[in-house]
Amino acid sequence: MRTNPTTSSPVVPTLEEKNLGRIAQIIGPVLDVVFPPGKMPNIYNALVVKGRDTVGQQINVTCEVQQLLGNNRVRAVAMSATDGLMRGMEVIDTGAPLSVPVGGATLGRIFNVLGEPVDNLGPVDTRTTSPIHRSAPAFIQLDTKLSIFETGIKVVDLLAPYRRGGKIGLFGGAGVGKTVLIMELINNIAKAHGGVSVFGGVGERTREGNDLYMEMKESGVINEKNIAESKVALVYGQMNEPPGARMRVGLTALTMAEYFRDVNEQDVLLFIDNIFRFVQAGSEVSALLGRMPSAVGYQPTLSTEMGSLQERITSTKEGSITSIQAVYVPADDLTDPAPATTFAHLDATTVLSRVLAAKGIYPAVDPLDSTSTMLQPRIVGEEHYETAQRVKQTSQRYKELQDIIAILGLDELSEEDRLTVARARKIERFLSQPFFVAEVFTGSPGKYVGLAETIRGFQLILSGELDGLPEQAFYLVGNIDEATAKAMNLEVESKLKK
């Protein structure tokens, strides 16, 4: 049963109708609360602890009911630090799940898991709120249209195209460029499509969250002069937050995105950085609640938790949510239960390679490991499909020959294989691209490359028309015309040196 947004914020009950409990036990972020007989709160109800600590500081902690233990006890997980809480403190049952502000008032603002603004720009209009726990849309409401979502990033659009209203995973270990790729996608999509985005920062670095906010202000995605004209809402539950906040912040972001889809009937982009931290927070909470761990120490409810989040991210007849999720891969092991469970829900995977990052090829997207259900001739067309397959075949052949080259050298290869290697190296470099958000690092202005331009460029390389150009001419350029211009400049420079 889907609940619609309400037009009033959840109010803590008045003194006469308050359902009061008392803290019986505190284990880190987990509280046991005793309620009067027959007054037990429901699962997922929000509880509020108000009072003062031993030095007189005001305490206001919101918790969420996770278990009913019997003997009039409930076990709840805190959404903020439990410092200063004591046994015997009063706990108020709000009688409803956590609800957060939704709609136009959220654009250009930063929120925490509770939907409270944390950007020092004053209060937010909370007349329209929505509970963070909802069921997924019914089958009859779903939209099954297949269409490509152009990103302007060559390697993505050609080899693993994104589906409009689909779910995309960015897989990679630490430091290979997941967050930079997400920032570039937000930038390109806001400029090219003019759509609304919601960014959920789940358990990532606070510094990155701050950088992203500043970047958005500079690029105009967040309009400081007129906040209402901004194109993005930000929801942060970063590394320093308790596991309860990190576990629920993804749902807060999703609830805001659902409102734009269902009520405003818009196409929305939902970015989650990082979905692994959502699983990790769930694992911490599961251990604190006393559940028996499953494979590799993860929670036994891993698939259920992931499914309840992912199934709400979908396209309906009203609008679509296209979700791009960064997935940290522990120890670069794709068979780890967290990334493996995520794989099952995705329409496309963009796998980032440490080998390519070490070569300085950015975005470090692996052309052979990245996949998409959209790369079919009936969806993308014969020309796109054939070009993508030939690029993959050439890259695969180069990969197979690398051992022979390392042992015997290039001269021992046949003429045909030498030509394949030369073209594969050009393709590898042409798959790199200067990003708008990385201009400060690369010194090169960012480039947005349309799909037709991308296909034309790779067809020219594969046809052999550009065999005479040096491979460094293809590195960090936009379309193929820039590569030929760069080759001419390199030739002029080399002549001047002589």
Curated annotation (Swiss-Prot):
CDD domains named among the record's database cross-references: ATP-synt_F1_beta_C (cd18110), ATP-synt_F1_beta_N (cd18115), F1-ATPase_beta_CD (cd01133)
InterPro entries, per database record = AAA+_ATPase, ATP-synt_VA_C, ATP_synth_F1_bsu, ATPase_a/bsu_AS, ATPase_alpha/beta_chains, ATPase_F1/V1/A1_a/bsu_N, ATPase_F1/V1/A1_a/bsu_N_sf, ATPase_F1/V1/A1_a/bsu_nucl-bd
Single Gene Ontology MF annotation: ATP hydrolysis activity
Q: Does the keyword Ion transport apply?
A: yes
User: What topology does it adopt in the membrane?
Assistant: Peripheral membrane protein
SMART domains, per this entry? AAA
Entry keyword annotation includes Cell inner membrane? no
- Catalysed reaction per UniProt? ATP + H2O + 4 H(+)(in) = ADP + phosphate + 5 H(+)(out)
What is this protein's function?
Answer: Produces ATP from ADP in the presence of a proton gradient across the membrane. The catalytic sites are hosted primarily by the beta subunits.
The molecule here is called: ATP synthase subunit beta, chloroplastic
Instruction: Report which gene this protein is encoded by.
Output: atpB
